[in-house]
Swiss-Prot record:
Organism whose genome encodes this protein: Mus musculus (Mouse)
Start and end residues of each Laminin EGF-like domain: 250-312, 313-375, 376-427, 428-477, 478-530, 531-577
Gene that specifies this protein: Lamb3
Ranges for region Domain I: 813-1168
Protein name: Laminin subunit beta-3
Subcellular location: Secreted, Extracellular space, Extracellular matrix, Basement membrane
Disulphide-bridged cysteine pairs: C250-C259, C252-C276, C278-C287, C290-C310, C313-C322, C315-C340, C343-C352, C355-C373, C376-C389, C378-C396, C398-C407, C410-C425, C428-C441, C430-C448, C450-C459, C462-C475, C478-C490, C480-C497, C499-C508, C516-C528, C531-C543, C533-C550, C552-C561, C564-C575
Role according to the record: Binding to cells via a high affinity receptor, laminin is thought to mediate the attachment, migration and organization of cells into tissues during embryonic development by interacting with other extracellular matrix components.
Length: 1168
């Protein structure tokens, strides 16, 4: 109740303090820092510490008074140690230095940072002539002077100015004032820090922060006051301070209004505690840091009305710790700088605001906070392996032909989602003509979805009596004339119905004109001849009925329709349309060829006129011939490289410049005016070609970079080199610019032309020579990889540079740069696909090995757990067996005790027989046989684990071999056959690893099944043992009760036996007395036989006789009962022996069960 009352009294002050701190900076109340801390104060000089010292002071006007200073013991009345300056020491205690020692210092070394407000010093003797006060805020590492004090500042500290300081580094000297009554002793010095900084424009909080923070304080007495001499002996000169008061509090940076004792600190009673009770969410002994989880802004001392309160970090409930990051604070423009630590619930980020990799935001509104981020639910078959899902939406990164948020659906037109497919799904094997465009096949089954009237597994056939599959809209009915046609089924491609004799037309609806049958031509009257056509490339009747000209199907060409038309790739008879980019390139190239041919025809007239005289013409012609010869030598080499092609291009360029630079008459001026527009069009056409080429090249490089195969990169580089070589040969954009320059040069020459010259004949001869020499056909054949039919010279090279009209390829022995590049590109694609499949198989093998290791670990853990269970069960059963054995011995001893009565024996026997054992002997034996059978079937765990380790080691070895094969495949440079061989070896190794892992998995599953069977048997056994234990506990209590009853009955039996023995003895004595009495009665009867009257004595004798007979009868009856009891005890003893024999048999069975269980426990304990 008292504590509650004190708390009630302190509560208003605490609430007021909180309110004060909530309005701005707050500071604790001040007190004397020296009280309780005098042990931290020291002086550089103290009188009488080693021996007593005498000092003399003036007494009156002309007398001297001398005293002793003995500071060896602190409690001496004349001890003047430094701790006497504390206000708690009393008025008659002071500190005094040694005589004539200067300078002297008093220094206070605090153990914590404190806030100083006021210094007050009372002197005992003369006031020093000069002194200074300084402080340290870093425990004595650096010192700063508060103020210099002197009676004469100019002479004592000439380098220090007087007045008020103007800034924090400005230190001034203040004169010491004299006492008004003229006394020389008992002066005072007071230094108030707020008054000291009164001239500095700063807030009170700033002044306290700059001046009040101290860890050490030092007062240096630098000059003794002059001592007046008025007698024969001068007074002693010394420094003495009677009282030093340091008003201050704990230093809290404006974040606390009270101080608390230091936990675990000194027990000395102090007036000012040194631990701040922090407010504003700050912490630390001096509130010099933000409290845990309040680091959203940097810590700052409180100033005036601004508390600079530390703000709580925003971790969205996923963390309780954070730290301040200046970089984050600057990036947020001073808004928040807290960075959360140890984010939980699978979150991360400076505010735990986003989910970790492979987790995404739970979109369920009522989800608990620990389920904010849930694992990605990507389908491993359709998602890119290892790629994380989107952290906000959960959208997985799908393979190329897979879609859906979980990547569990094939895109339209694809089916068969599998993990092994690097693209996820494969294209539907459906006809592009007969299947639906929006969904060619079903995503799950791959069954093709046909257009109307289209049938077949691949939707590649028209339904009966339908045709025109190529329309792409489904098949149409044949509409055969039912009277004039042989059947309703028409040709699926042409729609031609089978007509009766004399009828024709598509539907047999009109009378037929007699003509030669299909695949023949001519007239029926003059005879029909067979068409000379390859009918695999013809359509309809095969050839024209009149001329015999073959009618080629679209995509086929040639006189016999046995060649692929330009724009169709592959080999005859399979002619499919080339890629759309070919059509764009081909159109532009044909336009270019047409314009170049027009230019060539337009410039032919320029060679007929006479040229200007040019003395350097001969040298230029020779130079052209040498370059042509050099080009011919380069082209005759065994291989064509990029440098060779560049030299050929330079040679051709030089020849053209030579030809175009010759001085000729230019008669066709009107044609020259149109050349500028033609060249501009050609320039724009080549610019478009160049952009298309670069775009395709970038796409190809991007696709190539996704495949890490070294062989693929090598082949790609080879293809790029060949492509650049072909591009340099076929690129004419630079030639057009050169033609433009040549045209300008020709115009200059035209302006210089003033008449005839002597070079016309030479030009004509050169023109004739250039028309036939050099022959560029071999060079073109090397570049194009095929035989050119028409000759190509610098003067005349008709047609395309690499004609493809016949559509034939150069075959496997092609040596052309362009076909080689194409072949290399296709080969690279196949190798890249094989490498991707190989990587997928390696990943699957890794997963299988990891699963096997985890399964082995689980089996080992199960075995250890089983061992622990068996060991525990063994200990429990041993304890139960020991208790059972002791109980049996006690029961046996109890039953064989001769003093135990039959009723007690019967109760014990019935209690023993009422015990419920696990089952009868047959059932126990059957359970033991089941356990033995299961144990016999259970494989040796050590051997299985050893085999498992061997299998895992073998799998790892095979995996290493596969990795080496893959590395060798990556290191191949051009050896494609070796790459394929290594891939086959890797596939074989992977198959062996998979077989090994499957065998290991079977072994592990067998172990797990056996462990389960053992557990199924052990669990009932444990329950039986526990049941026996409970019954034995109850039986034990019952035995104790029966033993107590038996002991009581035994005591009663002993008492009854004693009574029976006494009664028997009395009966024997009575019988003997009766015999004697009977004998005397006979004698008396004989003596008194005459008298029939017995008298009084006779009556007495008769009564005695009757009593004796009654007593004898009772005695005989008691003897009979004792005999019956003896026989009954004999029968009980025999029953006890029988029951004891039964218990011995049961004890043997229990021993057998325990021995067997101990054996199995030992076996399983060593199987780990």
């Amino acid at each position: 109740m008292t504590a509650f009352f004190l708390l009630w009294l302190a509560l208003p002050g605490f609430l007021c303090a909180q309110q004060a701190c909530s309005r701005g900076a707050c500071y604790p109340p001040v007190g004397d820092l020296l009280i309780g801390r005098t042990q931290l104060l020291r002086a550089s000089s103290t009188c009488g510490l080693t021996k007593p010292e005498t000092y003399c002071t003036q007494y009156g006007q002309w007398q001297m008074k001398c005293c002793k200073c003995d500071s060896r013991l602190p409690r001496n009345y004349n001890s003047h140690r430094v701790e006497n300056v504390a206000s708690s020491s009393g008025p008659m205690r002071w500190w005094q230095s040694q005589n004539d020692v200067s300078p002297v210092s008093l220094q206070l070394d605090l153990d914590k940072r404190m806030q100083l407000q006021d210094i007050m010093m009372d002197f005992k003797g003369l006031t020093p002539a000069g002194m200074l006060i300084e402080r340290s805020s870093d425990f004595g590492k650096t010192w700063r002077v508060y103020q210099y004090l002197a009676t004469d500042c100019a002479s004592t500290f000439p380098q220090v100015h007087q007045g008020q300081p103007k800034n924090w580094q400005d230190v001034r000297c203040r004169p010491l004032s004299q006492r008004p009554n003229g006394h020389l002793t008992g002066g005072k010095v007071q230094l108030n820090l707020m008054d000291l900084a009164s001239a500095i424009p700063a807030s009170q909080s700033k002044k306290i922060q700059e001046l009040g923070d101290i860890t050490n304080l030092r007062v240096n007495f630098t000059k003794l006051a002059p001592v007046p001499q008025r007698g024969s002996y001068p007074p002693s000169a010394y420094f003495a301070v009677s009282q030093l008061r340091l008003q201050g509090s704990c230093f809290c940076h404006g974040h606390a209004d009270r101080c608390a004792p230091n936990p675990g600190g000194s027990t000395t009673a102090v007036q000012v505690n040194n631990v701040c009770v922090c407010q504003h969410n700050t912490a630390g002994p001096n509130c010099d840091r933000c409290a845990p989880f309040y680091n959203n802004r940097p810590w700052r001392p409180a100033e005036g009305q601004d508390t600079h309160e530390c703000q709580r970090c925003d971790c969205n409930g996923h963390s309780e710790t954070c730290h301040f990051d200046p970089a984050v604070f600057a990036a947020s423009q001073g808004t928040n700088g807290g960075v959360c630590d140890n984010c939980r619930d699978h979150t991360e980020g400076k505010n735990c605001e986003r989910c970790q990799l492979h987790y995404f935001r739970n979109r369920r509104p009522s989800a608990p906070i620990h389920e904010t981020c849930i694992p990605c639910e990507c389908d491993p078959d359709g998602a890119v392996q290892g790629a994380p899902c989107d952290r906000l939406t959960g959208q997985c990164v799908c393979k190329e032909y897979v879609q859906g948020e979980r990547c569990d659906l094939c895109k339209p037109g694809f089916t068969g989602l599998t993990f092994a497919n690097p693209k996820g799904c494969h294209a539907c094997d459906c006809s592009i003509l007969g299947a639906r465009k929006d969904m060619p096949c079903e995503e799950e089954t791959g069954r093709c979805l046909c257009l109307p009237n289209v049938v077949g597994p691949k939707c590649d056939q028209c339904a009966p009596s339908h045709w025109k599959l190529a329309s792409g809209l489904g098949c149409e009915p044949c509409a055969c004339d039912p009277r004039n046609s042989l059947s309703s089924q028409c040709n699926q491609f042409t729609g031609q119905c089978p007509c009766r004799e004399g009828f024709g037309g598509l539907t047999c609806s009109s009378a037929a004109i007699r003509q030669c049958p299909d695949q023949t031509y001519g007239h029926v009257a003059t005879g029909c001849r067979a068409c000379d056509c390859d009918f695999r490339g013809t359509e309809g009747p095969g050839c024209d009925k009149a001329s015999g000209r073959c009618l080629c199907r679209p995509g086929f060409t040639g006189p016999r329709c046995d060649q692929c038309q330009r724009g169709h790739c592959d080999r005859y008879p399979v002619c499919v349309a080339c890629h759309s980019c070919f059509q764009a390139y081909d159109t532009d190239l044909q336009e270019q060829a047409r314009r170049l041919h027009s230019l060539r025809n337009a410039t032919e007239g320029l060679w007929t006129g006479t040229g200007l005289e040019d003395h350097g013409l001969a040298s230029r012609l020779l130079d052209a011939k040498s370059k042509i010869e050099q080009i011919r030598q380069i082209l005759e080499g065994t291989s064509v490289t990029e440098q060779d092609v560049a030299q050929v291009a330079n040679g051709i360029l030089s020849i053209r410049r030579t030809l175009q630079g010759l001085p000729l008459d230019l008669p066709l001026e009107e044609e020259m005016e149109s050349f500028s527009g033609d060249l501009g069009n050609l320039d724009r056409s080549f610019s478009r070609l160049l952009l298309m080429y670069r775009s395709k090249k970038e796409q190809f490089e991007k696709l190539s970079s996704e495949d890490p195969s070294g062989a693929f990169r090598m082949l790609t580089m080879a293809y790029e080199q060949s492509s650049r070589a072909a591009q340099q040969v076929s690129d004419s954009s630079s030639l057009l610019s050169q033609l433009r320059d040549s045209r300008r040069e020709a115009e200059g020459l035209e302006r210089q032309a003033g008449g005839g010259g002597t070079g016309g004949a030479q030009l004509m001869a050169l023109r004739l020579e250039m028309a036939s020499l050099p022959d560029l056909t071999p060079t073109i054949n090397k570049l194009c990889g095929r035989s050119r039919q028409t000759a190509c010279t610098p003067g005349d090279c008709p047609g395309e540079l690499c004609p493809q009209d016949n559509g034939t390829a150069c075959g496997s022995h092609c040596r052309g740069a362009l076909p080689r590049a194409k072949g290399a590109f296709h080969m690279a694609g196949r190798v890249a696909e094989q490498l991707r499949n190989f990587n997928t198989q390696l990943q699957q093998t890794r997963q299988m090995i990891r699963a096997a290791e985890e399964a082995a670990s689980r089996v080992q853990a199960d075995a250890q757990r089983l061992e622990t269970q068996v060991s525990t069960s063994r200990l429990l059963m041993e304890e139960d067996v020991q208790r059972t054995r002791l109980l049996i011995q006690q029961v046996r001893g109890f039953l064989t005790d001769p003093d135990t009565d039959a009723a007690t024996i019967q109760q014990v026997s019935e209690a023993v027989l009422a015990l419920w054992l696990p089952t009868d002997s047959a059932t126990v034996l059957r359970k033991m046989k089941e356990i033995q059978a299961i144990a016999a079937r259970l494989p040796n765990v050590d051997s299985v684990l050893s085999q498992t380790k061997q299998d895992i080691a073998r799998a790892r070895r095979l995996q290493a071999e596969a990795e080496q094969a893959r590395s060798r495949a990556h290191a191949v440079e051009g050896q494609v056959d070796d790459v394929v061989g290594n891939l086959r070896q890797g596939t074989v190794a992977l198959q062996e690893a998979q077989d090994t892992m499957q065998g290991t998995g079977r072994s592990l599953r067998l172990i797990q099944e056996r462990v389960g069977e053992v557990q199924q048997v052990l669990v009932p056994a444990e329950r039986l043992v526990k049941g026996m234990k409970e019954q034995m506990s109850g039986f034990w209590a019952r035995m104790k009760e029966l033993r107590r009853q038996a002991q009581e009955e035994q005591a009663q039996a002993m008492q009854a036996r004693q009574l029976a023995e006494g009664a028997s003895q009395q009966a024997m004595n009575a019988q003997e007395g009766f015999k004697r009495l009977k004998q005397k009665y006979t004698e008396l009867k004989d003596r008194l036989g005459q008298s029939p009257v017995l008298g009084e004595q006779g009556n007495r004798i008769l009564s005695i006789k009757m009593e004796a007979e009654e007593l004898f009868g009772e005695t005989m009856e008691m003897m009979d009962k004792m005999k019956d009891m003896e026989s009954e005890l004999l029968r009980g003893s025999q029953a006890i022996m029988l029951r004891s024999a039964d218990l011995s048999g049961l004890e043997k069975r229990v021993e057998q069960i325990r021995s067997y269980i101990n054996g199995r426990v030992l076996y399983y304990a060593t199987c780990k």
